Amino acid sequence: MASPQQHTAAQEMEMEYAAGTYHTHEQVQNYLRGWAAASPELCALGSLGKSSEGREISILTLTDSGTGSHEIKPAFWIDGNTHAGEVTGCEACLHFVHTLLQRWQAGDQQIVELLRSSALYVVPRISPDGAELYLTTPHTLRASTVLWPNATSPPGFLAEDLDGSGEILTMKVPDPAGAFKQSSTDPRLLVPRAPQDNDPAATYYNLLPEGSYKDYDGFNKEASTRWGLDTNRQYPSKWEPQESSGPLPLFLPESEAVAKGISARTNICSLLTYHTYGGEVRDPLAATDVDDLLVFAQLTAEGTAATGYRKVRQCQSISLCD
């Protein structure tokens, strides 16, 4: 049976986690590899598969292997970063693992017993390609970097970093018919122009996004998104055709990897997925079995008590944890 006292100072260093920053794919992988190497009796690093661009979709299994295999224990699944910009969800997963290992090392009996009797599956980053683009370029996107619905960038206006600043900003353009004016409180700010604002000595502005037109035809046409696929619209349950859902369920390797990963682990009793929208704790759809809903209601109550987030009861027409 594993003992917290088995760790050396070198192993403790490997377990260190730098909070307060967002981590690239390789940095995330380094943490997972380090924890697995430092605590092999508790952590096993595996892969659910590879992303569209070939990055590992890693899963960290945590349990006290001295009390049996993870497969024979009730398990809890935690994941994050379903959507590209939800990098906070990834950090929440990393922080969770780091805190868990620290408390186990300190001999926290609640954590020691948890790992002896249960298993935890942690998938910090479901969409590694999208997160990498989000973190290393000025662009934002929904989830996958696969071009959709067009195989190439569509015509029209495309937001771009034109001046190499590393950011896609908004341009302030003087225009007598502009919809904004300078704030009287802070000249750095623009405020909406009121209907009666018609001072000939004042300067009015329009705000335009930084970017350029592809195949400009004389009309102000914004191009459709280059990256329109949503990993969270790819799962088979209640799947229906829509622009972000792709041509068929599990079309994206990321969605397929998660679906197969959960299905293969029949000991999973519950699941928590970290999204970053709404400040809410959402329980599953109303179609869930009544007995399960009672359990989820209790878990949701725990979540709202811990976070202060409001509870949201989801309708059947939207996907889980949108």
Language-model region placement:
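Flexible, small-residue-rich helix->loop connector segments that border functional cores
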Residues: 97-116
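Surface-exposed loop and adjacent secondary-structure segments within mature catalytic domains
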Residues: 3-8, 49-51, 113-243
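Short glycine- and acidic-rich boundary segments immediately preceding or forming the N-terminal edge
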Residues: 2-57
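Short, solvent-exposed loop/turn and secondary-structure capping segments
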Residues: 70-74, 87-91, 132-138, 146, ...
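Metallocarboxypeptidase
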Residues: 44-45, 56, 119-123, 129, ...
